[in-house]
């Protein structure tokens, strides 16, 4: 959504790792933007990243034992199994960080994000620049150019735009491509 989710998460992740914590960055296998590595929108490569199954993230659990900090990037794309994985990691004393969109472009709850938010000790809601009025830190919603598919795809910047509530609720339906 271009709200700096991955960049902000990377900053928190690296802060923990500086203090001798061993960290791992997990991304869903549906994210195929950069094969074998995780790259943020600002083209920063995330060290120690691993792609895991979006459908069955629990299969990665045994591999996570050596890590102190576990990051789930684009958490909205993981199945509901992510909830039991996060609970298990928390019981093991791990620091768990997740980023993702709360809502689809159709304003439906995105994946299991509402459950993850319920378990969060801290929630940071980031906003993007509205693609209609260009107001900074105002866009909280996404809309797809394809009205028949309201789900935002990972890395699909050409498939969707971000919009602030004011522009989204105006009587005139706006599209930055018009």
Region spans (language model):
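Conserved P-loop
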Residues: 1-65, 104-115, 125-128, 154-177
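Anion (oxyanion) recognition and catalysis
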Residues: 17, 90-91
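Conserved P-loop NTPase "ATPase switch" module shared by AAA+ and STAND
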Residues: 64-78
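Conserved ATPase-coupling elements of RecA-like P-loop NTPase cores
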Residues: 74-89, 104-110
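Structural recognition of the conserved hydrophobic beta-strand(s) that form the central parallel beta-sheet
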Residues: 94-102
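Short basic (Lys/Arg) and small-residue
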Residues: 120
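Short, cysteine/histidine-rich loop/knuckle motifs that typically chelate Zn2+
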Residues: 132-135, 166
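Short cysteine/histidine-rich zinc-coordinating motifs and their immediately flanking basic loops
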Residues: 142-149, 174-178
